[in-house]
């Protein structure tokens, strides 16, 4: 990306535990972080501080931010925010939304409408699907919707990759 000082910056957004940088502006670890409103933030209700899981309504927010415009049921209070509607598409679903707001080590704004927006201006909606069927046992299927919320067009220089590690054994 071209920074405000005219120099090129190379933003690689990583999310593994080790060797993550600290944001100079927010003084937080630079990684995708959960967006508020998509899980129950009250630890007295969501004791495990879990992301929203379809089979545990204690993890759900009071209402879903992305469903506020439903004129018949604004926010879908008390309902699961499923991929195909108010019910899970699998035996169990998880759902979380995150963004790259804390990637602020570069003199760069991805959105000219918002001078406080940092990172590449990306929002990621992630949904995990699990089934009890033996053919799909021990597997989580992940679906990612990645949205550029900023005003910067990245043309052909963005790559998406996922590294998964269950951390078994340490």
Regions found by a protein language model. Give the residues of each.
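A long-range scaffold signal marking pre-active-site subdomains of enzyme folds
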Residues: 1-170
